[in-house]
């Protein structure tokens, strides 16, 4: 009798475990999605979140450049952004860069940082693309994505994107695109005044 109860208990435990695994697999894609049901919002992305949606994974690499720790170094030809850590290392991120005719180089500093920024396309862009909205509030569908880091007095930014598949491509109007996960990580590591060096 006791043995029968033990076998029954073991069978129930196995079924419960299988049911739990199936439920976990069923809901896993929902919880791994980078959007929430309200369309994103401040605080949804966490610094240090894995960059699973980037075609170019974020990683720490050896870095030979002679720049102070904390410097952002952007290599547009390589389509990579480096945050210099010091001791010969940097965090390397994949980026999208300006298409032909929109790439640039120079040295600036971070002058502003915004979470879930709104977007107002500049007049030149509206002339090229009259179909664009005149203004878009921040959110998961906004082209600037989860974070924006403003460079000097230019219109250029390092920002997130609602098109993570474009990371590694030359498709922007001069800004540097990152996945929302990666730009959130970078945003948490830099401050106003951080030097930004852009090289073609």
Describe the role of every protein-language-model region.
Residues 2-200:
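N-terminal pre-domains immediately preceding structured catalytic cores
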């Amino acid at each position: 009798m006791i043995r029968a109860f033990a076998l029954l208990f073991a069978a129930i435990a196995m079924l419960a475990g299988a049911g739990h695994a199936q439920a976990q697999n069923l809901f896993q894609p929902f919880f791994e999605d980078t959007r929430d049901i309200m369309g994103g919002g401040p605080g949804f992305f966490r610094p240090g979140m894995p960059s699973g949606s980037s075609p170019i994974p974020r990683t720490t690499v050896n870095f030979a450049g002679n720049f102070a720790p904390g410097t952002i170094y952007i290599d547009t030809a390589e389509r990579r952004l480096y945050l210099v850590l010091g001791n010969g290392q940097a965090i390397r991120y994949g980026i999208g860069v300006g298409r032909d005719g929109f790439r640039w180089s120079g040295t600036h500093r971070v002058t502003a940082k915004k979470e879930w920024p709104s977007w107002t396309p500049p007049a030149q862009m509206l002339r090229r693309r009259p179909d664009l909205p005149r203004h878009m509030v921040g959110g998961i569908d906004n082209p600037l994505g989860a974070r924006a880091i403003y460079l000097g007095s230019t219109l250029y930014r390092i920002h997130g994107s609602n098109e993570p598949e474009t990371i590694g491509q030359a498709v922007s109007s001069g800004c540097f695109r990152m996945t929302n996960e990666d730009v959130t990580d970078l945003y948490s590591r830099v401050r106003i005044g951080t030097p930004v060096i852009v090289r073609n």
